[in-house]
UniProtKB/Swiss-Prot annotation:
The PDZ domains may also mediate association to membranes by binding to EPB41 and ADGRA2 together with the L27 domain that binds CASK and DLG2. Residues 162-212 are annotated as: Interaction with SH3 domains. Residues 721-896 form the Guanylate kinase-like domain. Phosphorylated by MAPK12. Phosphorylation of Ser-39 modulates transport to the plasma membrane. Phosphorylation of Ser-232 regulates association with GRIN2A. This is Disks large homolog 1. It holds the Pfam family PDZ_assoc. The lineage of its organism: Eukaryota, Metazoa, Chordata, Craniata, Vertebrata. Residues 224-545 are annotated as: Required for interaction with MARCHF2. One of its GO terms (cellular component) is membrane raft. InterPro entries: DLG1-4_PDZ_assoc, DLG1-like, DLG1_PEST_dom, GK/Ca_channel_bsu, Guanylate_kin-like_dom, Guanylate_kinase_CS, L27_1, L27_dom. It is a peripheral membrane protein. Residues 580-650 form the SH3 domain.
């Protein structure tokens, strides 16, 4: 019997009667479920479905009404008419819908095997007694794991039952189970009528009433995410808990940071602001922060996370722009093969150019997703195709864009952002929160607007409380200040450290207090002691004061210039030559004689990497030297500052405690990270992103910080072609260009692995396949590998012998490794040509890689600074340039000059 409106009204009346009888406390959950079903019956969508059914039954199936003067319509046969029965039970399922409207479940299941549904459908939290069933295992291709990370991830995609979800194209909202059954959980449905609601999942898990943030269960979607713990953990950070609510009074455990390269980032489904409900079988709702951390630590190697997140709603809008002298006036990022947001091929607006057409119009905003330009669709296209479509437009351009929305409106903090720690040309990430929430009137927490876009006036200037949990590397930031009551400021945030992962501290913050210890008038030493002795959980009250910090920086800069240009009173004014000492050194800094007013006689200019023949080193303050060029020694003799003078002046300049600097030991020591326990942080492409930072703190026992000045060298003849290691921004482009332009001069070596050989692979061509893991671990401990890592429980590494094999064939072996590998090659008597690309500024980086946003350029610049600080003494040369072509030409020239057969290598003697 067909369902009519009067049947719906009768069912609604029965439900309301039944609800009125549920007055007991134990009936609360059932009452809530009934109220939700009642709201469904009263919704416009449900009424529209009834109208469609009546039209279907009365009009389309009535043959006489289908007759036309020109032709006769065939009657439409119902594929699956509504079953007979009373609606009093409200048993509406996807199988009980009209045949013409029921979702193509089997077809979608087939599609699900080919397309990861994580972006379209979020599976519900499964029943507690069921483990994850694997229907698809995501495995990266061989080419994608050539550069092995220590972070490992396999995506375990849980099955999506046919009655639990429908494709995005279907407007039908599945509702299950039949009511009234008290054991079932509330139905997840929109609480307000929607013209075209997205697919909604039915929550049939056994969780009790969940904790909500400014919304009801209908505002959320649920997902089970299975991660395989890598050697560096799960790759995300959390905040919240009953003892430290993250948002308002909500004690939920929130994801605050996705670490690039980690298990979560490679899986791609977990997002910032996701709320963790359960870790494996451990319920982490309404627990303390430490309990949540403990649950994650004890979860084992395979970790099932049950999360909820606010549903994403986007509002499409059309924009008409008139091209001006500056064109359309905005920049884009993203596209197939160049994802701006992990797992999303969409084209995003990353920059609005002041004075351009988009800026004048005011409707297009950073973070908007472009759907079409004129009649050209921009969904699932490459970056180049999108650029071409935008370029090939007339003066009048019609854009269709989706406005990203924010999750929380009434919060003034800037968002914690996802940063990419290995800056490549395709690194363009904005906060994944661009998926979520409502459009804010101003920049709000977890809005898609990155920190780089927010002006200083848009960041809260009020004091705020930040709780950090000290890691193995300390708190992860530097402080400066503390003289004459000027305050203590944060001058540097270490990428990947606790401060960076929290996302709540920034350069320019003034520290007001630490664990209730007032630091407003503290000296630098007092602030350092307070931070060092604060324990594991450190509560910091900070206030963003960029103007004060800028004035402080300017004062430090002026002081630095004064000190470097001043004459040191201890200098004798003339050289003492009673005991002449001659040696060859390599300069580890640039020196401009015009800026040194204390010179006793004519000075000698030099740059980093220059070889100097010191012909008189008897004076404590000044040496006499000649410059050594590829053509021989120069005739010009000049005065240079001695090692002692350089180090004394630099230590005076650096009279600050650096919480992220490591105390350098003897440079001749082998880095103690090549044992099997060290594999987790010895990765093959960490050169742009990772450095080995020890515990932050002051120098102990009066030990002075290592200062770069000169390195003693000897000339040596080599009978091999030197390996090449290029570090810094744009290194991958330079490496590729070298191999492409000179395939006969540059090559790569074959790595080793303990992974079993695949059918199409050839031993010695694709990999050197090692049958014994124990043997490879032993070789690693014996320093036979310059770098090694673990992926999917298999070891991968680059051996000294593989590099030597390429070198002995007369080719430069291009190595994509970290700075640590330079020292290991030197110990193996394979002296590499190591070149550091030093960016001039953030603007310089953005000019060479126009796809980067301001924030990404800043992060790239900071990584380059840390890289230079960590490995400067190992660099053969440092290059700078305004363009990539300029840098490439310098690199080629350096390689040609340093190829040998006579090269300068570090000497064993000390200065």
């Amino acid at each position: 019997m067909p369902v009519r409106k009067q049947d719906t009204q009768r069912a609604l009346h029965l439900l309301e009667e039944y609800r009125s009888k549920l007055s007991q406390t134990e009936d609360r959950q059932l009452r809530s479920s009934i109220e939700r079903v009642i709201s469904i019956f009263q919704s416009n969508l449900f009424q529209a479905l009834i109208d469609i059914q009546e039209f279907y039954e009365v009009t389309l199936l009535d043959n006489p009404k289908c007759v036309d003067h020109s032709k006769q319509c065939e009657p439409v046969q119902p594929g699956n008419p509504w079953e007979s029965g009373s609606l009093s039970s409200a048993a509406v399922t996807s199988e009980s819908l009209p045949g013409g409207l029921s979702p193509p479940v089997e077809k979608y299941r087939y599609q699900d095997e080919e397309v990861l549904p994580s972006e379209r459908i979020s599976p519900q939290v499964p029943n507690e007694v069921l483990g994850p069933e694997l229907v698809h295992v995501s495995e990266k291709s061989l080419s994608e794991i050539e550069n092995v990370h220590g972070f490992v991830s396999h995506s375990h995609i849980s099955p999506i039952k046919p009655t639990e979800a429908v494709p995005p194209s279907s407007p039908i909202v599945p509702v299950t189970p039949a009511l009234p059954v008290p054991a079932e959980s509330p139905v997840v449905l929109p609480s307000t009528p929607q013209a075209n609601p997205p697919p909604v999942l039915v929550n049939t898990d056994s969780l009790e009433t969940p904790t909500y943030v400014n919304g009801t269960d209908a505002d959320y979607e649920y997902e089970e995410i299975t991660l395989e713990r890598g050697n560096s953990g799960l790759g995300f950070s959390i905040a919240g808990g009953t003892d430290n609510p993250h948002i308002g009074d909500d004690s939920s455990i929130f994801i605050t940071k996705i670490i690039t390269g980690g298990a979560a980032a490679q899986d791609g489904r977990l997002r910032v602001n996701d709320c963790i409900l359960r870790v494996n079988e451990a319920d982490v709702r309404d627990v303390t922060h430490s309990k949540a951390v403990e649950a994650l630590k004890e979860a084992g190697s395979i970790v099932r996370l049950y999360v909820k997140r606010r549903k994403a709603f986007r509002k499409n809008h059309e924009i008409k722009l008139i091209k001006g002298p500056k064109g359309l006036g905005f920049s884009i990022a993203g596209g197939v093969g160049n994802q701006h947001i992990p797992g999303d091929n969409s084209i995003y607006v990353t920059k609005i150019i002041e004075g351009g057409a988009a800026h004048k119009d005011g409707k297009l905003q950073i973070g908007d997703k472009l759907l079409a330009v004129n009649s050209v669709c921009l969904e699932e296209v490459t970056h180049e195709e999108a650029v071409t479509a935008l370029k090939n437009t007339s003066d009048f351009v019609y854009l269709k864009a989706a406005k990203p929305t924010s999750m929380y409106i009434n919060d003034g903090y800037a968002p914690p952002d996802i940063t990419n720690s290995s800056s490549q040309s395709v690194d363009n990430h904005v906060s994944p929160s661009s998926y979520l929430g409502q459009t804010p009137a101003s920049p709000a927490r977890y809005s898609p607007i990155s920190k780089a876009v927010l002006g200083d006036d848009e960041i809260t200037r009020e004091p705020r409380k930040v709780v950090l949990h000290r890691g193995s590397t300390g708190l992860g930031f530097n402080i400066v200040g503390g003289e004459d009551g000027e305050g203590i400021f944060i001058s540097f945030i270490l990428a990947g450290g606790p401060a960076d992962l929290s996302g709540e501290l920034r350069k320019g913050d003034r520290i007001i207090s630490v664990n209730s210890v007032d630091l407003r008038a503290a000296s630098h030493e007092q602030a350092a002691a307070a931070l060092k002795n604060a324990g594991q959980a450190v509560t910091i009250v900070a206030q963003y004061r960029p103007e004060e910090y800028s004035r402080f920086e300017a004062k430090i800069h002026d002081l630095r210039e004064t000190m470097m240009n001043s004459s040191v009173s201890s200098g004798s004014g003339s050289l003492r030559t009673s005991q002449k000492r001659s040696l060859y050194v390599r300069a580890l800094f640039d020196y401009d004689k015009t800026k040194d007013s204390g010179l006793p006689s004519q000075g000698l200019n030099f740059k980093f990497g220059d070889i100097l023949h010191v012909i008189n080193a008897s004076d404590d303050e000044w040496w006499q030297a000649r410059q050594v060029t590829p053509d021989g020694e120069s005739d010009e003799v000049g005065v240079i500052p001695s090692k002692r003078r350089v180090e004394k002046k630099e230590r005076a300049r650096l009279k600050t405690v650096k919480f992220n600097s490591k105390t350098r030991g003897d440079k001749g020591e082998i880095p103690d990270d090549m044992g099997s326990k060290g594999l987790k942080h010895v990765t093959s492409n960490a050169s742009d992103s990772e450095s080995s930072y020890h515990e932050y703190g002051c120098s102990k026992g009066g030990q002075e910080e290592y200062v770069l000045s000169y390195e003693p060298v000897n000339q040596q003849e080599v009978n091999y072609t030197r390996p090449v290691i290029i570090l810094g921004p744009m290194k991958d482009r330079v490496n590729d260009d070298l191999i492409s332009e000179f395939p006969d001069k540059f090559g790569s070596c074959v790595p080793h692995t303990t992974r079993p050989k695949r059918d199409y692979e050839v031993d010695g061509r694709d990999y050197h396949f090692v049958t014994s893991r124990e043997q490879m671990e032993k070789d690693i401990q014996e320093h036979k590998f310059i770098e090694a890592g673990q992926y999917n429980n298999h070891l991968y590494g680059t051996s000294v012998q593989s590099v030597r094999a390429v070198a002995e064939k007369g080719k430069h072996c291009i190595l994509d490794v970290s700075g640590n590998a330079i020292k290991r090659l030197q110990i193996a008597q394979l002296y590499p040509i190591s070149i550091f690309i030093k960016p001039k500024s953030m603007e310089n980086i953005m000019e060479m890689n126009k796809r980067l946003t301001d924030e990404q350029a800043r992060k790239t610049f900071e990584r380059a600074v840390r890289l230079e600080q960590e490995f400067t003494e190992h660099f053969t040369a440092i290059v700078q340039g305004d363009t990539l072509e300029d840098i490439y030409n310098q690199v080629k020239q350096i390689i040609e000059e340093q190829s040998g057969p006579y090269i300068w290598v570090p000497a064993k003697e000390k200065l």
